[in-house]
A protein has these predicted regions:
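Soluble extracytoplasmic regions of secretory-pathway and membrane proteins
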Residues: 3-875, 879-923, 938-942
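Long, low-complexity, intrinsically disordered segments
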Residues: 919-952
């Protein structure tokens, strides 16, 4: 029997040692793979690996030691209880292995802790200051945004671990008591060490919860502050009067109460005073609920009468913080009145009109797919826009299609890179309406953005997921040319001579082939003349270096100074807890919905498409989130000044940032606290849906800004007042001197420039326009319409290209017509030039742009203005009384003007109706007279006596 027990102990010890060694080996192998990934990126990134490795060792070793000692103490604590129980039953206590559970749990916990806290401890040690303070303690924003979340995560992790420990101890205790003993008496159980352990850990958890509650107090400043008035009804973010008085100081009082309660609770439990314990536990949720009730009464009763005045400074904080957090630095231009375009405006804007993208990116890509050969080894990826000497072009990168069914050998050695791409003219088509594009596949000169491309190959891209082996003896598929005469294919090959890739030894080759599940790496990767290229998908590649940054999922290609291709990836920093900044809902890089209130494009990453070289640039050194990463990894980042000029010249305003900023500007466009709270000047983005019921994306247009010699590629968004259809402003996002710039144009008055949706509907309701559109709507075809608004002078030109696509296998989009409109005039032509010419000719179609909702819109604003004035009068707020009277007077003046114009329109319609009736009457009289003359003529021929001379 003793021998069996001894053998069992030996087996347990052997297994213990085995699993410990296995854990160490797995850790070392995993670490080696990480090292290979960093080594492949370059020498400077090995420093990042070393920094991360130190952090990992610290996290895992400290976690292991603490966990091991902690579990060992728990086991020893329980063992004392077991000794007592076995002694009471006169049984020999079996030997309990204290070290094995402690060792295994220690190893497991250290691995989990590494994954949870990886990178976060470094963040904690390299915090950057915001230079702004918040709260009664006057702490820098960095505490609540950078430090507190990590501390809370640590406390939450400890809390979960302690709860699991209690579960572990309980199961351990129950198993021993039920399987080794004959149960346990209740009194013995209550007086036993397990209950003591449970009590101590419970009190410890209470203290942890209290600390988390203290830290969560800072979240008050990024909570829901107060609800805006109709029609918006959204909550402003921040801390209002009730929050900084009742809620904040109420929490401070509760914190001290909870601290005293926990101390006294511990004493009451020791004394086994159950009633007191229950009372103290129940008092906590009761007090929390009471605080919420008091806050509700304060907000809805005490300050309801004069809420705007009392909340004014907090709303102003919200406005300021929102503009800071989303980098909304608006250069605002006011256009006194929108004017209809004249020929002079068109002539002066010729440079802009010639580059209007009548071809969308989707149409351009669809066209390329139509012409692509079925057996093509390539796949078209991202389409981006770039200015060239010939005009604005779309560049669609052409990468290897690694999803095609090929042998593993072909994927590893032969089909491993893409080559250049296709350039599509965005503003012109040929005389038959076919899209103009240039798809180079040979050794001709490749040109992109006025730069000759000497190295057009793409080894690192968006679809380069496979690991590949390259070398001087390995011939890779490059491109093929089919002879026009013989129809035979000539295949050209390439040998990679870039600096990227690793020469691997047997061990590293085996390890990498194991992780990539590709044993060709092991077979050929260890050849001294070969190199292994891996981690080639560019988003994953940059995440390998710095995963803290959120990367744009739509990078674009630009030419570099060496005559190669470079990917530009926009990097973003964000948070949901920036004090007072307004929250907005977006989709993150994984497609999940998030509510954020801070977003900056502070980082750009350049990745060489040929050799995979990665370079990080920090563009906004005032962003503490970016500065924290820079502090963590010194010498990795370069500044905007270090960026090559050719890259700067081709940078685009980040669409993801712009789309968020455009939504923020709907409410935050240089307005006051009263306007924001009362929702008096809410805008809506003027968007339109395509045939698939999807909103058409914002697009890059060439727009000429003030004080700029040439038009710049810019993003454009049009706005209408909430629930109204007239354009009242537009936002331009452009790159000026290498920096993002937002320019907002506001119309003081505009009745002739309609939103995209309304203008589209008005045009398509017109009979003449319908006839033209019906001509191309045939059976077996699909009509695709695209729409955009182009700012010209003090007006806006509506442009709608119309494509016809035959519903067959090779469906090529063909431009059939272009519709343009401005004010009440519509021009239709086979091209943009013809359509603009017809807009100012006799063939122009006149449409009715009157919107019957205009009067109702003004009446609603007057009613709301009167309501606001009454509130100001009741609260005797003279500041807002004056403002409200001025606003109401202005609205009444606008109503009078609108009424006068409406009366003129009605009079004109009546006059036109009278003239039309008269014309109809005259026409009827004329027809009647002609009929009478015809009848008389026939009668005369039949019955009038014949002339005597005629008879003769």
């Amino acid at each position: 029997m003793e021998t069996k027990k001894k053998d069992k102990r030996v087996l347990i010890n052997v297994l213990n040692i085995f699993f410990s060694i296995l854990a160490i080996v797995v850790f070392m192998l995993y670490t080696r793979v990480e090292f290979l990934h960093m080594k492949e990126l370059g020498l400077e990134y090995e420093k990042i690996y070393n920094i991360n490795l130190k952090e990992k060792i610290y996290i895992m070793s400290i976690t292991f030691v603490i966990t091991f000692i902690y579990i060992l103490c728990v086991n020893l604590f329980l063992k004392k209880d077991f000794k007592k129980l076995f002694k009471q039953e006169n049984k020999e206590m079996p030997k309990i292995n204290l070290f094995t559970p402690a060792l295994l749990i220690g190893v497991l916990n250290s691995i989990v802790a590494n994954f949870v806290f990886r990178g976060k401890i470094l963040n904690l040690l390299h915090t950057a200051k915001f230079g702004k303070t918040v709260g009664i303690l006057g702490l820098d924003y960095s505490f609540s945004l950078l430090i507190s979340p990590i501390i809370q995560l640590l406390l939450f992790y400890i809390t979960v671990f302690v709860i699991l420990t209690i579960g572990y101890a309980f199961i351990y205790y129950i198993l021993v008591v039920n399987f080794k003993l004959d149960g346990i008496d209740n009194n013995d159980f209550i007086k036993g060490n397990f209950v003591k352990l449970f009590r101590r850990l419970g009190i410890f958890l209470a203290y942890l919860t209290l600390i988390i509650y203290v830290l969560r107090t800072f979240d008050i400043y990024s909570g829901d502050m107060l609800k805006k008035q109709q029609p918006d009804n959204t909550y402003l973010t921040g801390a209002g009067l009730g929050d900084v008085t009742i809620k904040l100081w109420g929490r401070v009082i509760l914190i001290f109460y909870f601290l005293i309660t926990i101390i006294r609770l511990n004493k009451d439990i020791k004394k086994q005073e159950g009633i007191k314990v229950v009372k103290k536990v129940i008092s906590i949720p009761v007090l929390l609920l009471s605080l919420q009730v008091i806050l509700l009464l304060f907000n809805n009763v005490i300050i309801r009468q004069n809420r705007l005045e009392k909340e004014n400074k907090f709303i102003e904080k919200n406005i300021k913080a929102t503009e800071e957090a989303f980098n909304i630095k608006l250069d605002t231009k006011v256009i006194s009145e929108a004017q209809e375009l004249v020929k002079k405006d068109i002539i002066e804007a010729q440079e802009v009109i010639e580059t209007v993208p009548i071809i969308s990116k989707n149409i351009a890509k669809q066209n390329l797919e139509s012409f692509k050969k079925k057996d093509s080894p390539y796949k078209y990826m991202n389409t981006s826009v770039i200015n060239t000497e010939e005009g604005t072009k779309y560049f669609t990168s052409r990468e290897i299609n690694d999803t095609k069914k090929r042998t593993i050998e072909d994927k590893t050695y032969v089909f491993n890179h893409g080559i250049f791409g296709a350039l599509t003219d965005s503003a012109h088509v040929d005389e038959d309406g076919f899209i103009l594009f240039d798809e180079k596949m040979n050794n001709d000169k490749f040109t992109l953005g006025n730069k000759v491309i000497k190295q057009p190959r793409i080894y690192y891209g968006l679809n380069t997921n496979k690991t590949t082996v390259v070398g001087k003896d390995i011939l890779e598929y490059d491109y093929e040319i089919t002879s026009k005469e013989t129809k035979e294919k000539e295949i050209f090959t390439n040998k990679y001579d870039g600096k990227s890739g690793l020469k691997l030894g047997k061990f590293d080759a085996f390890l990498l082939s194991l992780t990539k599940l590709d044993f060709n790496i092991f077979n050929e990767g260890q050849n001294k003349d070969n190199k292994v290229l891996f981690n080639r998908e560019i988003i994953k590649r940059v995440k390998t270096v710095i995963p803290d940054i959120t990367y744009d999922d739509k990078p674009y290609i630009v030419p570099n100074e060496k005559g190669g291709l470079t990917w530009v990836i926009d990097g973003y920093t964000w948070t949901s807890y920036y004090p007072y900044s307004q929250r907005i809902q977006i989709r993150d890089e994984n497609g999940n919905l998030r509510r954020i209130n801070y977003l900056k494009n502070s980082i750009k990453v350049l990745v060489d498409a040929y050799d995979g070289t990665v370079q990080f640039y920090i563009l906004d050194e005032t962003d503490p989130f970016a500065k924290q990463i820079q502090n963590k990894y010194p010498n990795i980042f370069k500044t905007e000044k270090d960026m090559p000029n050719i890259i700067k010249e081709n940078l685009l305003y980040p669409r993801k940032l712009y789309d968020v900023q455009a939504r923020i500007v709907e409410n935050y466009h240089k307005i006051g606290a009263d306007t924001l709270y009362r929702s008096e000047d809410i805008w809506e983005i003027s968007s339109v849906k395509n045939e698939n019921n999807k909103i058409i994306d914002t697009r890059y247009l060439n727009i000429k800004l003030e004080n700029e010699e040439k038009p710049k590629l810019s993003l454009l968004t049009m706005y209408t007042p909430f629930s109204k259809q007239n354009i009242n402003g537009y936002l331009i996002g452009s790159i000026v001197n290498g920096k993002n710039k937002l320019t907002l144009y506001k119309f003081d008055q505009n009745e002739s420039l309609l939103s995209l949706n309304l203008m589209r509907d008005k045009i398509h309701e017109d009979e003449k326009a319908k006839i033209e559109l019906d001509k191309i709507s045939r059976m077996g075809t699909e009509v695709v319409r695209d729409t955009m608004l182009v700012p010209i002078s003090t007006s806006i030109l509506y442009v709608e290209p119309v494509y016809q696509i035959h519903l067959n296998e090779n469906s090529v989009p063909v431009l059939k017509m272009v519709i343009v409109a401005n004010g009440s005039k519509v021009g239709i032509g086979s091209s943009l030039k013809d359509a603009v010419s017809n807009l100012f000719s006799d063939t122009a179609i006149n449409i009715n742009i009157y919107d019957p909702n205009d009067m109702n819109f003004l009446l609603e604003k007057i009613i709301n203005g009167n309501k606001n004035l009454k509130e100001s009068l009741n609260s005797k707020n003279w500041k807002y009384i004056g403002k409200d009277v001025d606003k109401l007077t202005k609205l009444i003046d606008e109503l009078e003007k609108a009424k006068a114009k409406d009366d003129m329109r009605k009079n004109r319609e009546n006059i036109d109706k009278i003239q039309s009736n008269r014309e109809n009457e005259n026409h009827e009289l004329k027809v009647k007279k002609e009929k009478e003359n015809t009848i008389n003529s026939i009668f005369d021929r039949i019955f009038k006596p014949e002339d005597s001379n005629a008879r003769k």
